[in-house]
């Protein structure tokens, strides 16, 4: 990827192996024209591909993807002459820069005073390069599993109730304050309560929203599949929650365009444009820890204060279908 870009006359900054939110942050901070992540997120290795980042550290929107496909179909790219190749620069502290930005956004001293002890399941993903550094900066003691860079996920990588049994056991065995698990590219976050109870990843956004509305003001945006917990929390504070089409770019673009306070998705993603342009599990960890410190309560006590809704998330394999006809019929029926 790097060689092709430089051979095309494009200057490249290599930030190494980092979480996706770190890459988004660096693209925004350095005012780059774009970025490329090689990732399959929580999917199996055969799904590895190029995740394209646009200006401002946001993923490409629908219009940009259409334009990109047209350029690809033209097959008009070319390599430049030898003396016109792009430059190559390596940055080794991208994660540290990202963490510094998060730390500036929160009350680090309040967290440090609590001497938290947490359990983490990194699923052998990129979170293992960043989260320990964040926790150390926050004065938090960490006990972890699946913290090896093997290139293979230790279990189902998507953060959900079905993949968190090992983390739950770790929490109960070590009597920690909370358990955290991230997906392999660390843009999504799920938690286990201090008694080992596994809760839906929908609570991640609700907890972050509860904290953010306790220290700041403003409306929010979430996608259509997100739990109504956040609507109830917003109503308590007198704020509104806009709903967007599913897709991180739809949420983040709506937040920026309408100058909203924050946004997110019920799959464990929190977006705070003042810190980072996309879903950020590292920020989510910091916000939840500060919420616990600020309210001086256990995570279980805080969860019990949030309105409860049930949601079942299942994936079904289906035969090849005509997507347009299928969606048209769904719209007609509902």
Across the structure, where does each feature detected by a protein language model lie?
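Short Gly/Thr/Asp-enriched flexible loops that form oxyanion-binding sites at enzyme active sites
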Residues: 1-3, 46-55, 130-132, 187-205, ...
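N-terminal small/polar loop signature for handling phosphorylated ligands or for N-terminal nucleophile
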Residues: 1-47, 133-192
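Proline/glycine-rich low-complexity loops and linkers
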Residues: 6, 15, 66-100, 193-266, ...
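Gly/Ser/Thr-enriched, mixed-charge loops and adjacent short helices
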Residues: 48-174
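Phosphate-binding and adjacent anionic-ligand microenvironments
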Residues: 178, 216-334
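Short glycine/threonine-rich catalytic loop with a Thr-x-Gly-x-Asp
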Residues: 182-184, 198-203, 276-280
